[in-house]
């Protein structure tokens, strides 16, 4: 029984893994952007790689193929905040526009835009979201960042990507990497089934789930059950809230994703039954309905069964 589970999920996770050229491409773009902004905001200093931080899925190691947007914070000096905060009107928008104009000098042929919390540079292979940020180094907020939000007339918000990263790493250490693996697989579900739920919310829910899942210390042999059990778990959070690590702001989950989650759970139930019965092809068909073509159909098992039947 369950003869195909390990092979199925090892292959699936391999398909989701970014390739080295993709990682190098992302890192190269982030560094070019950082160098452009560094020369603007630190004109008398040699470039310092610690002036920017990759955040989001790339920063936390949960990025998957196909490539997604790269999010980065660029650390802006506090004297810039003093200057911007003294302006009238939407101060946050003016900061983003200043960053945009700076990047246009380096990337004149790129249609760079600024809105919300980020300046967006849509390169051919990656969209890079650049968030100018002011870093707190002392006091209660040490380690956190203040970022601009241009919506509703503009305001300053707080972000703590280090706390998010550390929390995920702690869960991974306690579960042999299951949190990161599950997040990557669920991103494939989100993309394939067009699920209306924020990736950050999925990451938070995965961390909560994995810390209490009874099989968290087991191997990849249990990943079919992990998928099934997570979809059952998340149904308890319909219209609930999640809160990113390190900040007090909460994110409303809503219920737009409920129907697709129930469908995924039903398909996972079938897939688990097929896995137990060693029907690798039927199981892979159900998994593919959830995750898309990156979960390959198990033609090997199908051909072997046909050969046995012959």
Language model: regions and residue ranges:
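Short hydrophobic/aromatic beta-strand micro-patches
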Residues: 73-75
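Short, well-structured alpha-helical interface segments that form or flank functional binding sites
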Residues: 94, 114-116, 125, 139, ...
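Acidic/Ser/Thr-rich, low-complexity mid-to-C-terminal regulatory regions of eukaryotic proteins
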Residues: 131-178
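Conserved catalytic core of two-metal-ion nucleotidyltransferases
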Residues: 4, 8, 24, 37, ...
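Helical (often loop-to-helix) elements that flank the catalytic cores of nucleotide-handling enzymes
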Residues: 82-93, 133-147, 221-232
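N-terminal regions immediately upstream of nucleotidyltransferase
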Residues: 1-53, 57-67, 78-90
